[in-house]
């Protein structure tokens, strides 16, 4: 009987996995494990914290594990950096590529840059952030560590993240990545902030209560509905065939193209965020820099195209002219002619070698 029940449960998980549920149930125990919860940004790195990088946890049970990355933060919430006691000359805000996952604390872009310049370069990158969250964190937390230069550093899919409030719609299974976002008003004359919806973390146990908020403020709800059907017509048959040793190739560029399409759909949103960045820089007297970074799939994608064919080129060209005080950098300038792309990545993020190259590139442009 127990065998039949467990078999039925396994079949049910295949036919109706959590990823297909719009609002699965979570216990208070599940919520308690969400230690990085933040009541304004959705989530944020904890200060004075040491953790094993998530992508490396599968290696921790090996007898002689190698390459395990440890992420340490200081009392201010920055990832550990060289010259920690010095006044910060430069501070980074951004996503996991800014934080530099998959490498040690002393192999990150800010660490290398700090060594080159003999100064503290703080690192406030947070995994899975969009440009909007990075900007909001800068505006909220800059007062606690002022610097002469601020670098907003995000990957090329960042605008699709900016159009999300419930990341599960964009990345099925990412249920706790609930966030604020900026939205352009209907007359396109101003930007408004859609605030994080929860007052306390326990409200996540009742996601369905916020159904209307999620569906009306997230641009990816229709994508999630489409993916739900796609699971039964494409993904499930592939899973069944794989059980019989038959693997079918998948078109991995479709997801990337979807994400990149938001550059042109949300051009005004990007311009308004850059306007806020420049205004905040002027108010606080720091030099603003925007750095575009690339996941491996993004770098492979752009290598086969001219700059004019890339979704972000024309969009970024406009604020270059409108906001001359912002320096715009793209790491593709140093990587697009690099022959061995594999050398630039470890698992899902940049390798120490790539991080060193990026820090040298930034240093030359300061």
Where are these regions (language model features)?
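Membrane/wall-proximal cationic-aromatic binding patches
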Residues: 4-112, 116, 227, 256, ...
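Loop/turn elements at helix/coil->beta-strand transitions in domains of secreted/extracellular proteins
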Residues: 118-120, 146-150, 282-288, 324-326
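Catalytic His-Asp segment of secreted/periplasmic serine-dependent ester chemistry enzymes
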Residues: 297-366
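Residue-level recognition of beta-strand->loop/alpha-helix junctions
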Residues: 125-127, 292-293, 330-333
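Structural beta-sheet core signal
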Residues: 92, 152, 290-292
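Serine-dependent acyl-ester chemistry module
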Residues: 3-12, 16, 157-317, 334-339
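Conserved SGNH/GDSL esterase-like catalytic core that processes O-acyl groups on lipids
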Residues: 99-186, 193
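Short, amphipathic alpha-helical "lid/cap" segments that border enzyme active or binding sites
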Residues: 131, 135, 267, 271, ...
């Amino acid at each position: 009987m127990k065998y039949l029940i467990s078999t039925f449960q396994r079949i049910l998980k295949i036919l109706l996995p959590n990823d297909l549920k719009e609002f699965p149930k979570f216990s208070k125990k599940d919520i308690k494990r969400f230690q990085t919860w933040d009541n304004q940004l959705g989530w944020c790195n904890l200060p004075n914290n040491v953790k094993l990088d998530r992508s490396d946890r599968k290696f921790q049970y090996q007898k002689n594990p190698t390459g395990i990355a440890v992420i340490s933060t200081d009392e201010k919430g920055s990832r550990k950096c060289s010259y920690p006691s010095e006044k910060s000359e430069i501070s980074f805000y951004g996503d996991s590529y800014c934080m530099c996952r998959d490498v040690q604390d002393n192999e990150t872009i800010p660490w290398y840059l700090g060594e080159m310049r003999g100064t503290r370069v703080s690192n406030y990158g947070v995994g899975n952030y969009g440009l909007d969250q990075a900007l909001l964190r800068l505006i909220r937390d800059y007062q606690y560590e002022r610097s002469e230069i601020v670098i907003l550093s995000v990957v090329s899919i960042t605008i699709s993240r900016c159009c999300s409030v419930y990341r599960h719609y964009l990345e099925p299974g990412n249920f706790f990545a609930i966030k604020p976002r900026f939205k352009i008003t209907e007359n396109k004359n101003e930007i408004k902030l859609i605030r994080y919806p929860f007052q306390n973390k326990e409200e996540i146990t009742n996601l369905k209560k916020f159904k209307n908020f999620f569906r009306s403020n997230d641009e990816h709800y229709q994508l999630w509905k489409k993916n739900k059907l796609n699971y039964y017509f494409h993904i499930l048959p592939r899973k069944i065939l794989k059980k019989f040793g038959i693997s079918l190739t998948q078109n991995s560029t479709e997801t990337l193209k979807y994400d990149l399409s938001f550059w042109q759909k949300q051009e005004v949103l990007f311009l308004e965020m850059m306007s806020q960045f420049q205004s905040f820089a002027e108010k606080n007297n720091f030099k603003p820099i925007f750095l575009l970074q690339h996941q491996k799939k993004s770098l492979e994608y752009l290598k086969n195209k001219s700059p004019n064919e890339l979704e972000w080129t024309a969009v970024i060209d406009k604020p270059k002219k409108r906001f001359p005080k912002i320096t715009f950098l793209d790491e593709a300038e140093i990587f697009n002619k690099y022959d061995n792309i594999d050398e630039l990545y470890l698992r899902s993020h940049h390798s120490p070698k790539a991080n060193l190259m990026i820090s040298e590139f930034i240093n030359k442009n300061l």
